[in-house]
From Swiss-Prot:
The gene is psbA3. One of its GO terms (molecular function) is chlorophyll binding. It catalyses: 2 a plastoquinone + 4 hnu + 2 H2O = 2 a plastoquinol + O2. This is Photosystem II protein D1 2. Residues 345-353 form a propeptide. Tyr-161 forms a radical intermediate that is referred to as redox-active TyrZ, YZ or Y-Z. It comes from Trichodesmium erythraeum (strain IMS101). It is found in: Cellular thylakoid membrane. CDD domains: Photosystem-II_D1.
Length: 353
């Protein structure tokens, strides 16, 4: 009898926990994805803050030349970063228990792996949680689809690119200057500016900004007047009101005359789908581009494409970019290479004595 009561009580505790996790009445929805999201994002955040403030220098290139990234070792907010794990570790999984000591783990950049793996699991589960809450509320599932764009971009630079290059030391550093260094080296080694998928991403981000500004300014300029001149326009809207707060016909008429009729949406639903889809598709393409360049399928190379009748090269902007790329390449990891990879890959000339 006692066992039966105990089992029933345990079942009730589990049922209460399940109903709490999946309840949409909570101030912040938890969800089953949230059960994994909360501890992983907390772990990533706490480790990142500690490492950014106090981590000792990391031997990122695997050549016994540690690079300092934390505030306590001479950096500021701009130059500071969590430095990627050592090239000596490569793609090996490097948790704390794989190191001989905590000092060794820190020296080889263990915190970087801890942060990015927990962060990636955290953002994957955040995306799942968006779907889960939409499902519970009977909404359509496109919020998590839109969020998949930045998730794909983060996965590309923190996971796919290091896998393709053979080492987590090639992942993006977790800091401001480190991010710019990553971008410059990426251009030097992969010519990303000449990759069509990056171009589509630029069109997505800049176009999305343009369309967002256009939409916001058009709506704000065609609000239905509900207030006096001395009151804020914002008081003219009551949360949950049934009436439209702006005149879409006026906005359509204005923009249709400013450009031409068919450049202006006359359907609010298709308009907002377009506003969501444009930047998302662009960022998808950029993430796909980075993921292919990870395996050295690089941007277009038009170096020395134009030659005169005598066979002399007529330099174009492509050759200027190539010179810049070589300059950036010889400057990065200065003590790890004697030559940029492009020059080192050329077969040495034979020497006849």
């Amino acid at each position: 009898m006692t066992t039966t009561l105990q089992q029933r009580e345990n079942a009730n505790v589990w049922e209460r926990f399940c109903s709490w996790v999946t309840s949409t009445d909570n101030r912040i929805y938890v969800g089953w994805f949230g059960v994994l999201m909360i501890p992983t994002l907390l772990t990533a955040t706490i480790c990142y803050i500690i490492a950014f403030v106090a981590a000792p220098p990391v031997d990122i290139d695997g050549i016994r030349e540690p690079v300092a990234g934390s505030l306590m070792f001479g950096n500021n907010i701009i130059s500071g970063a969590v430095v990627p794990s050592s090239n000596a570790i490569g793609l090996h999984f490097y948790p704390i228990w794989e190191a001989a000591s905590l000092d060794e783990w820190l020296y080889n950049g263990g915190p970087y792996q801890l942060v990015i793996f927990h962060f990636l699991i955290g953002i994957f589960t955040y995306m799942g949680r968006e779907w889960e809450l939409s499902y519970r509320l009977g909404m359509r599932p496109w919020i998590c689809v839109a969020y998949s764009a930045p998730v794909a971009a983060a996965t590309a630079v923190f996971l796919i690119y290091p896998i393709g290059q053979g080492s987590f030391s090639d992942g993006m550093p977790l800091g401001i200057s480190g991010t710019f260094n990553f971008m410059i080296v990426f251009q030097a080694e992969h010519n990303i500016l000449m990759h069509p998928f990056h171009m589509l991403g630029v069109a997505g981000v800049f176009g999305g900004s343009l369309f967002s500004a256009m939409h916001g300014s058009l709506v704000t300029s065609s609000l239905v007047r509900e207030t006096t001149e001395t009151e804020s326009q914002n008081y003219g809207y009551k949360f949950g009101q049934e009436e439209e707060t702006y005149n879409i016909v006026a906005a359509h008429g204005y923009f249709g005359r400013l450009i031409f009729q068919y450049a202006s949406f006359n359907n609010s639903r298709s308009l907002h789908f377009f506003l969501g889809a444009w930047p998302v598709v662009g960022i998808w393409f950029t993430a796909l581009g980075v993921s292919t360049m990870a395996f050295n399928l690089n941007g277009f190379n038009f170096n020395q494409s134009i030659i005169d009748s005598s066979g002399r090269v007529i330099n174009t902007w492509a050759d200027i970019i190539n010179r810049a790329n070589l300059g950036m390449e010889v400057m990065h990891e200065r003590n790890a290479h004697n030559f940029p990879l492009d020059l080192a890959a050329v077969e040495a000339p034979s020497i006849k004595g």
